[in-house]
């Protein structure tokens, strides 16, 4: 039993890193713009398929698949901001209207993916996968890479937001958009940029997930919910909170498999979210915005 729990904990730490990366990609956008960007799930989907098309169909290196995924995701994210969210803001639409528009966009996008790519999973290969054994505990080089890449990107984004002028502008708009505009910060440019940044981070998460699983038309939904959960559990606008929440979610889901079937993982995830909302409405380390 002890070996099983250690193995599940290792799995949980790895998945927790990916959950944190997913959460970061959505948290950046939500904490800055206040938009409940449900269509962010399309970013994961588009990135996964872009990598598959470049790597598997065109026969190009996986590195180019990553680059293509980021480009496609950034273009799509910016298009959603400029083509849907900004016009709705100009018209004075409520957050509920914007949310419904985002949800409708997601449903339409998934339907188009279903028509174009068919409902069959598309595998993505190209990463050298070997098994690392430490005693009776094992994990693959791909999952180790997922862990390292996820935390490296999270650290990089944290440093960017903390130390650069544009990063401070993003934080200023997220904290007080009216004051930021009074200081000469162009809110619309910041909104567009955070959609690009969040989409780029989301693309990396989407490709890492596709490498471990596969690309399919409904892949965005299983990824967007962990992004929501770690954002609200960790705290809106808190990168450290998202990182901790991702780790907790990954551990909780995987360790529970020692006693429960995989069908209960979603229930556990939302139980954590519900408990966090009741006990810590602002999240573990959030500002409460």
Description of each model-found segment:
Residues 15, 138-215, 239-245:
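Helix-loop-helix "hairpin" substructures at the membrane interface of multi-pass membrane proteins
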Residues 116, 175-182, 186-189, 260-289:
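Cytosolic-side transmembrane-helix boundaries in multi-pass membrane proteins
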Residues 4-57, 83-93, 97, 235-239:
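Single transmembrane alpha-helix segments in multi-pass membrane proteins
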Residues 87, 91-163, 189-190, 255, ...:
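Transmembrane helix-bundle core of multi-pass membrane transporters
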Residues 32-36, 57, 65, 75-120, ...:
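Short loop segments and helix-boundary regions at transmembrane helix junctions
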Residues 5, 9, 42-46, 63-71, ...:
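Hydrophobic alpha-helical transmembrane segments
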Residues 21-25, 42-46, 203-204, 216-236, ...:
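Hydrophobic alpha-helical segments embedded in the membrane of multi-pass proteins
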């Amino acid at each position: 039993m002890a070996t099983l729990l250690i193995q599940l904990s290792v799995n949980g730490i790895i998945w927790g890193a990916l959950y944190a990366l997913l959460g970061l990609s959505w948290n950046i956008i939500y904490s800055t713009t206040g938009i409940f960007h449900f269509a962010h799930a399309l970013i994961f989907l588009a990135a996964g398929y872009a990598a598959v098309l470049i790597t598997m169909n065109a026969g190009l290196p996986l590195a180019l698949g990553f680059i293509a995924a980021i480009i496609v995701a950034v273009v799509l994210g910016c298009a959603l901001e400029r083509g849907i969210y900004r016009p709705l803001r100009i018209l004075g639409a409520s957050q509920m209207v914007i949310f419904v528009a985002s949800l409708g966009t997601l449903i339409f996008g998934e339907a188009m993916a279903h028509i174009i790519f068919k409902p069959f999973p598309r595998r993505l290969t190209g990463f050298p996968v070997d098994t690392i054994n430490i005693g009776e505990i094992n994990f693959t080089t791909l999952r180790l890479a997922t862990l390292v890449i996820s935390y490296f990107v999270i650290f990089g984004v944290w440093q960017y937001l903390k130390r650069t002028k544009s990063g401070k502008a993003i934080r200023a708009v997220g904290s007080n958009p009216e004051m930021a505009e009074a200081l000469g910060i162009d809110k619309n440019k910041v909104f567009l940029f955070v959609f690009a940044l969040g989409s780029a981070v989301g693309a990396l998460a989407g490709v890492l997930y596709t490498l471990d699983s596969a690309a399919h038309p409904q892949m965005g939904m299983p990824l967007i919910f962990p992004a929501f959960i770690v954002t609200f559990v960790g705290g809106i606008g808190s990168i450290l909170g998202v990182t901790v929440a991702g780790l907790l979610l990954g551990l909780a889901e995987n360790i529970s498999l020692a006693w429960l079937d995989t069908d209960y993982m979603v229930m556990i995830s939302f139980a954590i979210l519900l408990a966090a909302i009741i006990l810590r409405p602002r999240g573990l380390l959030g500002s409460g915005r």
